[in-house]
């Protein structure tokens, strides 16, 4: 039987682009594991993606996951848009390269061994786990230590 895991995620960017961070909280039964990291120059969408990626990549066995994000970009992208992006060779409907393709591909790989149900929660609306992830993300953004090597200025 697979483990039932809840994941909560959030990304933050101080300026967009600017210093950014992600926060994630993994919960299995009574155990919780917070994750966060800060990047010197990135975007809010990249940090939202990184939160989900980091959390999923932390799981060591196949799991049934409920992943809660306040990012419609992440939820819509992974449940809907990604199918056509892949069919078109990672191009949008108007034949432009998909933004953040490095992270979309990494997220696509990260979900393969798990059963993931994506849930959207309204950000900054008092959802306790989302608020905790927001605090982790903002703290990480305020003290960035990493380079987002995939970030490309437009």
UniProtKB/Swiss-Prot annotation:
Start and end residues of each RNase H type-1 domain: 1-142
Positions that bind Mg(2+) 1: 10, 48, 70
Gene Ontology molecular function terms on file: magnesium ion binding; nucleic acid binding; RNA-DNA hybrid ribonuclease activity
Cofactor(s) in the UniProt record: Mg(2+)
GO BP, sorted A to Z: DNA replication, removal of RNA primer
How the cofactor is bound: the record states: Binds 1 Mg(2+) ion per subunit. May bind a second metal ion at a regulatory site, or after substrate binding.
Q: Which SUPFAM superfamilies match?
A: Ribonuclease H-like
Protein location: Cytoplasm
| Ligand binding (Mg(2+) 2) | 10, 134
Q: What class of enzyme is it?
A: hydrolase
So what family is this one in?
A: Belongs to the RNase H family.
Assembly, in brief, is: Monomer.
**Full protein name:** Ribonuclease H
Q: Which organism is it from?
A: Pectobacterium carotovorum subsp. carotovorum (strain PC1)
Q: What is the lineage of its organism?
A: Bacteria, Pseudomonadati, Pseudomonadota, Gammaproteobacteria, Enterobacterales
